Curated annotation (Swiss-Prot):
Belongs to the F-actin-capping protein alpha subunit family. Keywords: Acetylation, Actin capping, Actin-binding, Phosphoprotein. The modification N-acetylalanine is found at residue 2. One of its GO terms (biological process) is actin cytoskeleton organization. This is F-actin-capping protein subunit alpha-2. The modification Phosphoserine is found at residue 9. Component of the F-actin capping complex, composed of a heterodimer of an alpha and a beta subunit. Component of the WASH complex, composed of F-actin-capping protein subunit alpha (CAPZA1, CAPZA2 or CAPZA3), F-actin-capping protein subunit beta (CAPZB), WASHC1, WASHC2, WASHC3, WASHC4 and WASHC5. Interacts with RCSD1/CAPZIP. The gene is CAPZA2. InterPro entries: CapZ_alpha (IPR002189), CapZ_alpha/beta (IPR037282), CapZ_alpha/beta_2 (IPR042276), CapZ_alpha_1 (IPR042489), F-actin_cap_asu_CS (IPR017865).
């Protein structure tokens, strides 16, 4: 193993380390980072060479963070990325610096939104926050309003997680919704993602996603926001139900086909009893 390690260049070592970090399960970034740090045994190389991996992980995972001086969390996403390590909090109208390794948000500064789309963004944000509060016990949402390719666009991101390291599991829900503000009707595009890692007496990961498309009637800001949330709620409810039903079916069929829970005799083997019996026979033979 040492010979193989010696043959790898620093670039190859960093590339491998970055892959481990990017694919770290939710809630386990620090554990993976510490393991990679021990394997690489070069802190400067890791910090400089894998910095992009830290950033990609936080952006991909919709990492929630509390900005210094503000109470409510904001999500780290590509839509709020201002470049040079700065991100945007559209609700509080501030930009801030984000340390991808420490996961700390500092140096908040005023950042005004695009006036042309702000009233729409605010209406969707109000409706979305109410929806998230109702359906996600630990949920955080961030709603952006942008002009993309000349079109006024609303982007809503949701993140909710449960980290239960003491019970050997961690999980995260992410969803992203987008629509353009056009007369009469528009198309809503969404992607839903679930990632769960269970690692007690084994190592099982659930990684699932679903793409959504639907049409939305565009009227005034408030009514459009309400109709948008109806689409979001229906799609996310359906997805969650399908995941639950699918894995119940797998538990009842696929998993049982792969491995019996009990032997053919339908009774569990008492290994202690067998061992005692075997030892007793051996003692008698002696």
């Amino acid at each position: 193993m040492a010979d193989v390690e010696d043959q790898l260049s620093d670039d190859e070592k960093v590339r491998i380390a970055a892959k481990f970090i990017i694919h770290a399960p939710p809630g386990e970034f620090n554990e993976v980072f510490n393991d990679v740090r021990l394997l690489l045994n070069n802190d400067n190389l890791l910090r400089e060479g894998a910095a992009h991996a830290f950033a990609q992980y936080n952006v991909d995972q919709f990492t929630p963070v509390k900005v210094e001086g503000y109470d409510e969390q904001v999500l780290i996403t590509e839509h709020g990325d201002l470049g040079n390590g700065k991100f945007w909090d559209p609700k509080n109208r501030v930009s801030f610096k984000f340390d991808h390794l420490r996961k700390e948000a500092t140096d908040p500064r005023p950042q005004e939104p695009e006036n042309a789309v702000e009233s729409w963004r605010h209406s969707v944000e109000t409706a979305m926050r109410a929806y998230v509060k109702e359906h996600y016990p630990n949920g955080v949402c961030t709603v952006y309003g942008k002009t993309i390719d000349g079109q006024q666009t609303i982007i809503a991101c949701i993140e909710s997680h449960q980290f239960q390291a003491k019970n050997f599991w961690n999980g995260r829900w992410r969803s992203e919704w987008k629509f353009t503000i056009t007369p009469s009707t528009t198309q809503v595009v969404g992607i839903l993602k679930i990632q769960v890692h269970y690692y007690e007496d084994g190592n099982v990961q659930l990684v699932s996603h679903k793409d959504i498309q639907d049409s939305l009637t565009v009227s005034n800001e408030v009514q459009t926001a309400k109709e948008f949330i109806k689409i979001v709620e229906a799609a996310e409810n359906e997805y969650q139900t399908a995941i639950n039903e699918n894995y119940q079916t797998m538990s009842d069929t696929t998993f049982k086909a792969l491995r019996r829970q009990l032997p053919v005799t339908r009774t569990k083997i008492d290994w202690n009893k067998i061992l005692s019996y075997k030892i007793g026979k051996e003692m008698q033979n002696a």
